[in-house]
C-alpha cells in the first residue's frame, strides 16, 4: 500500500517504499498527472512502472546530507513546474524516501510562494496534513526565503 498526504487541492507529499505498483495505483486513484522524485538513486524503475509521459516525471538527484545543494538550487524551477502543471489542471505528487524532509521542504516552499506565507505558517500547514521532519539545512534555506514589506500600511511577507 502506498501512502501520501494531500497538502492542498493539487499537491501530495509522500515517500518511496519500493512498491511501484502501489504507487501507480495511488496516482491513478488520485488523478495525479505529475511526479517529482527527490531521491539519491536511479528512478528508472519508478519511471518505467508509472508509465508517465516525458515531462510528467521530474527527478532531482538529491541527498539528505547537509552538503547537498541540489534541492535548494532546484526549488524555484520546481515551484515553476508545479505552478505550470497545476495551471493545466494537473495534480502533483512530490516524494522522497520517507516523505518527511526533502518532499516536505518542497511542499513548504510551494505554500510559501503560492500563498505568500512565512515559513512557520507554511510548515504548520504541511504538518497539519503529514508528520514531517525537515532537515536543518533545508529549514535554513526556507527560512531565508521570506522577507517583509509594507503594503497599504500592513507588514506583508514576500517570498522569493
Swiss-Prot record:
It catalyses: O-phospho-L-tyrosyl-[protein] + H2O = L-tyrosyl-[protein] + phosphate. Belongs to the protein-tyrosine phosphatase family. Non-receptor class dual specificity subfamily. Its EC number is 3.1.3.48. Pfam families: DSPc (PF00782). Keywords: Hydrolase, Protein phosphatase. One of its GO terms (molecular function) is MAP kinase tyrosine phosphatase activity. The keyword DNA-binding does not apply. PROSITE patterns: TYR_PHOSPHATASE_1, TYR_PHOSPHATASE_2, TYR_PHOSPHATASE_DUAL. It is an enzyme of class 3 (hydrolase). InterPro entries: Dual-sp_phosphatase_cat-dom, Prot-tyrosine_phosphatase-like, Tyr_Pase_AS, Tyr_Pase_dom, TYR_PHOSPHATASE_DUAL_dom. This is Tyrosine-protein phosphatase 2. Residues 3-154 form the Tyrosine-protein phosphatase domain. It comes from the Viruses. It comes from Orgyia pseudotsugata multicapsid polyhedrosis virus.
